[in-house]
Amino acid sequence: MADTWSIGAHAFTSRLLVGTGKYPDFPTMQRALAASGAEVVTVAVRRLDLSKKGEESLLAWIPKGMKLLPNTAACFTAEEAIRTARLGRELEMGDLVKLEVIGDRRTLFPDVEGLIQAAKVLVKEGFTVLPYTNDDPVTAKKLEDAGCAAVMPLGAPIGSGLGLRNPYNLRIIMETVQVPVLVDAGVGTASDAALAMELGAVAVLMNTAIAEAKDPVLMAEAMRAGVEGGRKAFLAGRIPMKLHAAASSPMSGLIGS
C-alpha cells in the first residue's frame, strides 16, 4: 500500500518538496528536480520574469507532471503577500500557496502577525494555505485555527544549512496541531532531512541544500534517500534511549558457565 499524504484536495506520494532558486543553470535544475523524485516544486511568483518565453522561461524547465506551489517570497507585508498569492492564481498556478511574510531582511524570519493576517484573508478566498512560520507551537496553533491546510516551521534560517536547530519545538508542534507539519528551511544535508522525518514531519521542503551543493543532482538523490529512510524509521519505531548497555544475546545459559 502506498504511503501517501495529502494537503487539502491534493494527494502525494513523495515527501520531498523542492525549489527552483539558486541553481547554476536551468538544465542542472531540471536534472536535480527529476532526481529528487519530488512531485511538488515551489516557485517564487515575484521573481518570475513573465517576459521570457520558451527555453528562456524557468517554467519551461520544470519536469512535466510536477505540481507547482507558488510562494510569496520577498513579501514583507501581509498586503504584498495577498497580492502575490492572487497573482499566482491568475497565472493558473492553482489554489495552493506557500505563504511567506518576511519580518527581517537579515535573518528572513517570518512576521508572525502579518502571516496570520494574510492567512485569514487567503483562506476566505479559497486558497489552500501553507504558511512558512517560526518554530513556535503557539503560532502554529494560531495558523491552524486561521484555516491553514498545513504549517511549515523552519528548521533554521532560510539558506543557512544549519540543520534542525530546535527539534524539540518541532516535535511539540507536531503534537499540538492536527494539520500536516512540513519542515521548511535550514536543511543542509541528507541527515537533516532524515531527522525531520524521524521526528514525525509529514514532508520536508528544501532548495538551497540541493541547488548550491557541489553536485546538485547527486545531492537531490541523497535528499530523496534521506527523506525516504527517515520516514521508514519513523514508521518502524526507534528503540527507547537507555543510559546503560543492554546485551543483544541472553546472559544466561552461556557455554562454560
Swiss-Prot record:
Pathway: Cofactor biosynthesis; thiamine diphosphate biosynthesis. This is Thiazole synthase. Pfam families: ThiG. It comes from Anaeromyxobacter sp. (strain K). Its EC number is 2.8.1.10. Homotetramer. Forms heterodimers with either ThiH or ThiS. It is found in: Cytoplasm. The active site is at K98 (schiff-base intermediate with dxp). The keyword Membrane does not apply. The gene is thiG.
